[in-house]
Amino acid sequence: MSRNPSRTTTARQPSTPLSGAEPGDGAQEATAEVTTRRKQYIIGPKQAAGLSPMASETILTALQATPGVQIDGFIQLSRPQVFAAGGLGGRYVKASMPVDRGLQLQRQAMASSTLFMQENVRLQHMSDTVPFDVGSLLPAPAAATAIVPVNVRVLGSDGRPVVNAMVSAYGAGFVQAATDGAGLATLNFFGGTVDDLAALYVKPFADYWERWIPSPSLRSDRENLVTLQPLENWPGANLRRGQPFVGWGERLMGLQGSDASLTGKGAKVAIIDSGCDTNHPALSHIKIGLDLTNLDPNNNPDPNTWRNDVISHGSHCAGVIAGNGNNGIRGFAPEAEVHVLKLFPGGAFDSLIEALVYCVNHEIDVVNCSLGSDQVNEGVAQQMSEARRAGIVVVVAAGNSAGPVQFPARLDTALCVSALGQAGTFPPDTYHAQTAPSQMQPGMTTGANGLFAPKFTCRGREVRLCGPGVAVISSVPGGGMAAWDGTSMGAPHITGLATLVAAHHPMVTGMARNANRAEQIQNFVISLAQPVGMDRQFVGDGLPLFVGHSEPAPSPGIAPQASDLQSIVSHAFDDVLTH
């Protein structure tokens, strides 16, 4: 889950008839009264200990006989040879119906120990449209009033226009616009003035640092200029154009990008996200994927459109996990076999279940899920358990709502990852700086060496590890790079490390694909964690460290700054490298 206000990550509503339409209505009228839309539900057998689940066909027959219910489709859970061996078999039913009918059937399902029925809710990347700590937004006008246009021109420090930057103003409501080819964005304010704004936030699409300007001096009678700095201008980024780039988080964890023996070759990693731009030089080696948001008449995912990443989120995660370093980021496992499963925009619980089924059927080793929901789904939970039984480690972002860990990260079958920031890795006039705690809280949300738990990260006992998640620079579509925040960025760091373990640790070689295999990989990754000096509900066991090309040395109690990493070795991982 990323905090990326430059991209609105709304997903499609689960497929239902148009508003007001009933099954069998036929052609839609050109004009129709707006009514409450029907809802789609996932209905299936519940896997309860000691109980035989209700047969899928029995469920289907009952639904077909219920007035007002439309069968929308099915979710095939596993290939026959998988569930014949003792796993979860059969299929779930997707059905839409009026809200009152859905509530009635849900009450009946809740009383059953062999059946579940839950709404097919859209998943989220949790990209915040309103940053934290902008203060109380002033009330918007009660009715439409005169429009006050305010022009903001965004240029780089070299004078070039910054195209497709998102300019957001917070004050009397919320106003947003994107820059055009000349770097110009027009913010249209409805009534009021522009001298009482709380903040102006400029988020470039790629290659520049963002700007966060509190109490901005905007005027409607002139052009307002905002100048952005290239990413490479900030020394803490350690970025040199045209050279392989290793981010601050990777360096902090011990990845230097120079050890040819640690590439992830032989492991399979899946990225369940928004797709991947394989035209990006750092991602051009990724060849396998499916678009679960684009289905043919036979319900088969499109095998090509996964390369069209309109949200950029999946490409950013892919860079951290498996970037090849070609004019861009060098990720943890550039030679791993990457499977891209596109869920966004449009992903709901049904798509996530289908993606997890794919991972079981294709013997994936590690899965990255930088997504979540504030609602739960039994079907997803059961398929997460099936993935664990198939030997798969599923890494899930904790969430960015600054509250309890979200679903499915809260499941015992997930490796839940929160976000970690470090002072000095971003300029002070960016919103990255605003994510740090307002007050130093040693032992709670702030640790040594400038480490901190960002305000947005979800917290709770379910958090197992933390991962770098503030100002993480990685690949975005079009060949550029961008700095993003979020537990969505923390999770790929842990996914990348787990992929290296799956590829190179001798204990994994030849192991049967079962729950023990997944637990061994996950537990080993957790064993690499070093305390970061903060409360466990924010960071879990800490940040995993490894250095594969240094002499053994005692590990510190607190994660070091990146410059200190040459003197740190995780003894456990060092044992792997000697085999």
What are these regions (language model features)?
Residues 2-133, 258-264, 268-278:
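Long, contiguous interaction/targeting segments characteristic
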Residues 2-7, 69-152, 170-174, 178-244:
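Autoinhibitory propeptides
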Residues 36, 53-58, 148-150, 155-172:
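Short, ordered, surface-exposed loop/turn motifs in non-cytosolic proteins
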Residues 159-178, 182, 190-194, 203-332, ...:
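Active-site core segment of subtilase-fold serine proteases
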Residues 164, 318-321, 339-344, 392, ...:
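Hydrolase catalytic cores
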Residues 319, 346-369:
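Substrate-binding/charge-relay-adjacent region of secreted/lumenal peptidase catalytic domains
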Residues 360, 364-369, 382, 390, ...:
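C-terminal subdomain of the subtilisin-like protease fold in secreted/lumenal serine endopeptidases
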